[in-house]
Amino acid sequence: MAPAPVTSAGPDQGTSDDVALHRALFVAILRAAYSGELAAALAYRGHWRSLWRAHRSDVRAEIRRIEAEEWHHRREVGKVLAEMGSGPQRWREVAMWSVGRFFGSLCFVGGWFGPIYAAGRLEGANVGQYEQAAVHARRAGLDHYLPGLALMTATEDRHERWFGNLIAQHPLLPLTSRLLGWRPPPPLDETDPEGGLSDRRPDDLDGAGATADPAEEQRPDPSR
C-alpha cells in the first residue's frame, strides 16, 4: 500500500476538520484491529492444537489456515499504520497477547461448541471493524486503502460463515445467541471443498500452516 497522502476535501468529504477526524478514527480502528488480530491468531493456534482427534482433522486444518490469515491481516494492518505515521499501542498489545493465550489454553479443557461460537462471534466483530475503517478511509480521502480493506472484510466474513456453519444445528445455539447476541449468518456454498476460503486466501498462504513472525508470538514488553 502506498504512503498516505495529504488530501484536500473531495466530493465525499467535509471540511478539513472532518477529514482530520476521519483520519484519526481510521487509525484508531486499525490500531485496535492490529492487536485484535494478535489475540485471534494466538487463540486459533491453541484451538487447532487442541483438536488432536482424527475425525476432526479437517476442522483442525481449516482453523490452522484461518490462523495464518489472521497473521497476514496483522502484517497488512501494520503496514497501513506505519504509512499513516502511527503504530500499535503497547498496552493493547500486552492485553491482547494475554487474551489470545488465555482463550487458546481454554480450548484444551473446554467443550467443542464454546470455542467455535466464540470464534464466529469474533470474526463477525472483525467484519464490522474493517467495514467501519473503510467508511472513515473513504471520508478521509484515503481511497487507495479501500481494496485492501474490502479483501480483509471479505475474508473475515468467510471465516465467520465457516465457523457458523459448524454450529448452525447445535442445540445450544439458540440459547447462547439469545444470551450473547451473535447468530451465525447464512451458510457458505457447501460445494466449495475449502469452505469458501480458497478464492480469498493470499497465494503465500496456500497449502501452508500458520506462519508468524517469531517476535509477534512473544509476550510484548509493556515498558517499551
Report the location of each language-model feature.
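Non-heme di-metal
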Residues: 1-224
